[in-house]
Amino acid sequence: DFDLGSHSKKQNDLNIKSNITKNKDSNSKLAVQEDGEWVVPYVIEPSAGVERGFLAIINEAYSVEDLEDGKSRVVLKLKPHLSPIKAAVIPLKKNNKEIVSLSKLVKKRLQKLGLGRIIFENTGNIGKSYRKHDEIGTPLCITVDFESLDDKSVTVRDRDTMNQTRIEFEKLNDFLINTIKN
């Protein structure tokens, strides 16, 4: 039992530490001697804040994977419906106007689905873009390349497996809906 009144009386007493000793019978538990008896102090701190739940989700999703080439990658394996960014559309060649404009068109079409945030990634090379989106938990990276101009399809890379699949424009909406919602 703990009396909050006695705690309040000593809250500004900096010498209270001198009354705390370790019980010889306990392995590593701290004990306070009061009237010749040993009492193991305990605190119950109920908390139901959003921060703790968020931290638990982030902690569970964070992982570092060793790759075959000896390097490692950081991955935030959030469930797709929890991920703040649902997909990143990445043009393979940043200075090719046709690829960039097609990438923006793909992004615009996917945003109309209303699944969440779809971003256009136009910085760095493709490998660095993939790693960046692995770290921030983006489940899918959609790459628009030179083949996309001819065959009207894109390469979709899965964050967790790193597998890449070619998907036609007409099937991309359904693929994204199934991946994000399931």
Language-model-detected regions and their locations in the chain:
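NTP/phosphate- and nucleic-acid-binding module
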Residues: 1-182
